[in-house]
Amino acid sequence: LRSDFLLGPERYNKLIRPAVNKSQQVTIGIKVSLAQLISVNEREQIMTTNVWLTQEWTDYRLVWDPNEYEGIKKLRIPSQHIWLPDIVLYNNADGVYEVSFYCNAVVSNTGDIFWLPPAIYKSACAIEVRNFPFDQQNCTLKFRSWTYDRTELDLVLTSDFASRDDYTPSGEWDIVSLPGRKNEDPNDLTYLDITYDFVIKRKPLFYTINLIIPCVLITSLAILVFYLPSDCGEKVTLCMSVLLALTVFLLLISKIVPPTSLAVPLIGKYLMFTMVLVTFSIVTSVCVLNVHHRSPSTHYMPEWVKCVFLHKLPAFLLMRRPGRSNVRERFRRKHQRKSFSSHQDGDSFFLTDDPGRVCGAWRVGDLPEGSEFRQRVKVRHDQDVDEAIDGVRFIAEHMKIEDDDEGIIEDWKYVAMVIDRLFLWIFILVCVVGTLGLFVQPLFQSYNTPVAEEVYGDF
């Protein structure tokens, strides 16, 4: 039947399209069945798919009467022996336009031909990186005849959506919908193609675990910079370590997403946001260290600084400055009492023996008036006491100056602590608001926005 009747050279030529005359169109029914979504290369912007390209048409030359051939109604004929429509993938990315395997074609006695060749296509796909890794892509497969135009071949969709009956799920992508459409150009009557839209949504778990969560944890370490005491000397070191870690993650992102200037990926925006925050923390840490190590000999504390950073801001930030220690306060009160007593008893003197032991103490006024001993004691007393008082006053003034300087130094340290606490709350607020502002909307759209079945098909 096949060799003697159907495919005889006197009645069949596989190079001629099956049309009765040159003006007749040959209708080709096309349907795509997705077997596997192999990969989506974001950097090269290529989607690799394993599909079955169903093609159906009628060849009037391959008609026979089943009663004459023992009731045979179908034949499996090698596709190389019959005319085939030259349907190719127009938007391929590797130069392979045709199918991978030329399987047999199923020919019915009515001339209807069913051909289902498998193919692995690498198609160009414009990757939208704006919401990466919570993104949704729309990659297309565009099919059309390579040599026949619309006046010779009419391409029709046998189904509005690509089939997923034999689809193997992907570990990285979810299939949202696979709608197909027929495209015609009103300005070009010869143009015709069949386009399938592969609407796919990324599964973000891998990138959430390996990129987003580590970035958030590393950024949270920058918060500790403002809680770290200035005396430890590691504030800037911690900031630089965090900034270096974020730079490494930024280099990893640059190797994944395509090098496009049309949009910045979401994870890239977050990394840049955190790097700006960490850089800001470095600047503030340097300023805080500068304030912390100030002294009265180098800087003067203005009154507005005392008012704002020593009184108003600590109360607003719920900070309470500890008072002076009890030991130091008792020492100051004792020193004040002794100074007062020295002024009240300025005319008293002590008598000591040779080893320096105190034998007694008298006031000059207690001695008899006009006695020689009183005159000598008074002269000696005036000279020694004046020298002692001058020395004590010098020491007291020196201690008072040191105490005042130490108090001013403590005030500068407290100002630095208040600035640290202020920027700590600012950093936490900006970090939380910025993170939620960047991720909540794409995450909400990715998981909670339903896709209409009548528009996008089954999912």
UniProtKB/Swiss-Prot annotation:
SUPFAM superfamilies: Neurotransmitter-gated ion-channel transmembrane pore (SSF90112), Nicotinic receptor ligand binding domain-like (SSF63712). GO terms for molecular function: acetylcholine binding; acetylcholine receptor activity; acetylcholine-gated monoatomic cation-selective channel activity. Disulfide bonds join 125-139. The chain crosses the membrane at residues 204-228, 236-254, 270-291, 422-440. The record marks 106, 114 as: Key residue for a rapid dissociation (K(off)) from the conotoxin BuIA. Neuronal AChR is a heteropentamer composed of two different types of subunits: alpha and beta. CHRNB2/Beta-2 subunit can be combined to CHRNA2/alpha-2, CHRNA3/alpha-3 or CHRNA4/alpha-4, CHRNA5/alpha-5, CHRNA6/alpha-6 and CHRNB3/beta-3 to give rise to functional receptors. This is Neuronal acetylcholine receptor subunit beta-2. Keywords: Cell membrane, Disulfide bond, Glycoprotein, Ion channel, Ion transport, Ligand-gated ion channel, Membrane, Receptor, Synapse, Transmembrane, Transmembrane helix, Transport. PROSITE patterns: NEUROTR_ION_CHANNEL (PS00236). Component of neuronal acetylcholine receptors (nAChRs) that function as pentameric, ligand-gated cation channels with high calcium permeability among other activities. nAChRs are excitatory neurotrasnmitter receptors formed by a collection of nAChR subunits known to mediate synaptic transmission in the nervous system and the neuromuscular junction. Each nAchR subunit confers differential attributes to channel properties, including activation, deactivation and desensitization kinetics, pH sensitivity, cation permeability, and binding to allosteric modulators. One of its GO terms (cellular component) is acetylcholine-gated channel complex. The lineage of its organism: Eukaryota, Metazoa, Chordata, Craniata, Vertebrata. Activated by a myriad of ligands such as acetylcholine, cytisine, nicotine, choline and epibatidine. nAChR activity is inhibited by the antagonist alpha-conotoxins BuIA, PnIA, PnIC, GID and MII, small disulfide-constrained peptides from cone snails. Gene3D superfamilies: Neurotransmitter-gated ion-channel ligand-binding domain, Neurotransmitter-gated ion-channel transmembrane domain. It catalyses: Ca(2+)(in) = Ca(2+)(out); K(+)(in) = K(+)(out); Na(+)(in) = Na(+)(out). Its main location: membrane. The record marks 54 as: Key residue that may interfere with effective access of the conotoxin BuIA to the channel binding site. Residues 229-235, 292-421 are cytoplasmic. It is a multi-pass membrane protein. It is found in: Synaptic cell membrane; Cell membrane. It comes from Carassius auratus. Residues 1-203, 255-269 are extracellular. Belongs to the ligand-gated ion channel (TC 1.A.9) family. Acetylcholine receptor (TC 1.A.9.1) subfamily. Beta-2/CHRNB2 sub-subfamily.
